[in-house]
Amino acid sequence: MKITSVKNEKELVSFEIDLSEKKWNEFLDKEILKASKNLKMPGYRPGKVPLEIAKKNINMPVCFVNALSSARERIEDWIIDQDEFKKMADEICDFDPVTSKPNNSNNVLNKTVSFTMSFGKYPEFKVKNVKDIKIEKIESKVNKQMVDQAIEKELAKNETMSVKERAAKLNDIVIIDFKGYVDNVAFEGGEAKNYELKLGSKSFIDNFEEQLVGLKAGDKKDVNVTFPKDYHVANLKGKKAKFEVTVHVVNEVETPKLDDEFVKSLNLKNVNTVAEYKKHLEAELQKQLDGTVDNQIQSALYTELNKMVPSDLKIHEGLVNNVAEIFISRLMISLIGKVVNIDEFVKMIDGGRGALTKEKLIEEEKNQAREYLKVKFALKQYSKVEKISVSNEDIEKEIKEIAANSNTKEKEIKEDFAVYSSIKREALDKKVFEYLKNQVAKAAK
């Protein structure tokens, strides 16, 4: 096999590869041998028919097509290690070809075959000055209100209840049966038995809860309410309703007092007083907020990078398909733990409801792939503009992490040009994104 030409175009880098007659015959003979294994002919045992005789008695066009497929797969692996490819590697954004086709496949008698393989390139376009990337200001400092709300939640988690032989009050939890009617007809979803309801929680519509104040265990009452005009059930919007309610139990809720004894009961390390507890909460909330803010900045930056790609930029469909296939495989692994045929996957996930189709899934993942590629293109441009590169230490760190997680030797990763290059690209993308995020974060906080 040899590369006979390299064409560097706007969107693609294309390589023409010739297979020698000897190499092509290796692929073809292998397919002929497969096809002749079960060939029965007088004078020969099955699988022992000479190739030249077998060729006249098997479906040669099928063997030819299968040989082309095998040759194409082998070339896709082979080309990545060639010097001509490596020279162009930094311009190529995906090492899976967007097109891979034989040039002279119309004649099964051909003694040699050539292929053209095209790879998607990083497009060139202008990106904003980093200082001009603007995102909305984000609250990044924990305040007193946040701490107070966290304390209220913790106190509520430790509430206790006790049954009371008295009339219900706001903040009591009552256990009730209820059945609802609209125009004297019971409606779906309007009935429950032994339901726990905190009076004043506003979890029921209108003033339903307030109308139960004053009732005791054993009392019955018709509660009249009106459904909101924007209620989520269409046939109940704005309707007047009557609920037949029976009260079984009235529970008084006792909220613990925030004092040193309560704090000690939480068994927090080195936290024994209210003051220490508030400091502890503030620190924990700040950690959570830092994570939330970081995610918000990342999301906003992702959107901004996406917008920078010119709207008229054409992304090769083959490139989109390659990324979409990866996304679909990842989705399969995350949901069912393995990669299966896409039709089988859709059937498993949809369960026969018809909400998800193969076409819909592919289109959704292709849209995600386009968004992903746009960001990848923008990051590549910023790596040039800001002169950001990855050091050997950056790559070594990534390799060590991958080797540890995949039980693969570091040496094997380094010796595989495709894998090594992919790691290098991911490390660069990560470094550029972190740089941009840090710059944007200064203005956002």
UniProtKB/Swiss-Prot annotation:
InterPro entries: PPIase_dom_sf, PPIase_FKBP_dom, Trig_fac, Trigger_fac_C, Trigger_fac_C_sf, Trigger_fac_ribosome-bd_bac, Trigger_fac_ribosome-bd_sf, Trigger_fact/SurA_dom_sf. Residues 171-256 form the PPIase FKBP-type domain. Keywords: Cell cycle, Cell division, Chaperone, Cytoplasm, Isomerase, Rotamase. It is found in: Cytoplasm. Disulfide bonds: none annotated. SUPFAM superfamilies: FKBP-like (SSF54534), Triger factor/SurA peptide-binding domain-like (SSF109998), Trigger factor ribosome-binding domain (SSF102735). Its EC number is 5.2.1.8. It catalyses: [protein]-peptidylproline (omega=180) = [protein]-peptidylproline (omega=0). Coiled coil: none annotated. GO terms for molecular function: peptidyl-prolyl cis-trans isomerase activity. Pfam families: FKBP_C (PF00254), Trigger_C (PF05698), Trigger_N (PF05697). GO terms for cellular component: cytoplasm. One of its GO terms (biological process) is protein transport. Consists of 3 domains; the N-terminus binds the ribosome, the middle domain has PPIase activity, while the C-terminus has intrinsic chaperone activity on its own. Involved in protein export. Acts as a chaperone by maintaining the newly synthesized protein in an open conformation. Functions as a peptidyl-prolyl cis-trans isomerase. Belongs to the FKBP-type PPIase family. Tig subfamily. This is Trigger factor. It comes from Malacoplasma penetrans (strain HF-2) (Mycoplasma penetrans).
